[in-house]
A protein has these predicted regions:
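Basic- and aromatic-enriched surface patches that contact anionic nucleotides/nucleic acids
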Residues: 2-178
Length: 178
């Protein structure tokens, strides 16, 4: 199942978190590591999903569930919550934890590293890209900014490839056991 599909299922309430699951406990280092692994196309584990009847499902959060069945995320919650927060720019409906763990992630186009926003390091540096902004609006706006800076021209094709690689993380297939 593609990452984008999982996030869409959460948005419409067809995938939820069972009430017995713990809250979100990941820290920024774990989130950064996840994004680095996905960027490098390394495996990040599978999802364990329990399909059950909506009327008997006890879930976290206040999101409405669809009639019929719902997919409950039994394993993979920390990864999916992190990805949801980075890609959507907000926590999912079932969120219980510290949203700072996935807020403000940036990527450096030369060094190919993910780091969380630091104004002294990143402000006014066009090589630091806001990952959430990139995921939400695509690479076009970032490319437009880079094209206007003549000294970046020699590396522009590499930068475009890296931007597209990050944006394509949404299309990565995660193995899901149902």
């Amino acid at each position: 199942m593609k990452i984008a599909t999982v996030l869409d299922l959460i948005d419409i309430g067809s995938m939820a978190l069972p009430e017995f699951q713990r809250g979100y406990v990941w820290n920024r280092e774990q989130v950064r590591g996840l994004m680095h692994s996905l960027y490098k196309k390394h495996p990040v584990g599978s999802l364990l999903i329990w399909v059950t009847k909506t009327e008997t499902a006890e879930t976290r959060g206040d999101g409405a569930l669809p009639p019929g069945t719902v997919k409950l995320l039994l394993d993979g919650q920390q990864r999916i919550t992190s990805l949801y927060g980075i890609i959507r720019g907000r926590p999912p409906k079932f969120f219980d934890g510290n949203a700072e763990a996935f807020t403000g992630l940036h990527f450096h186009l030369d060094d190919e590293v993910f780091e969380f926003y630091s104004p002294t390091k990143m402000k006014d540096n066009p090589l630091w890209i806001n990952v959430t902004e990139l995921m939400q609006i695509g690479s076009g706006k970032a490319i437009e900014r880079l094209v206007k800076i003549p000294e970046l021209a020699p590396n522009l094709s590499d930068y475009i490839n890296r931007l597209n690689a990050i944006d394509s993380i949404k299309q990565i297939e995660l193995h899901g056991e149902e």
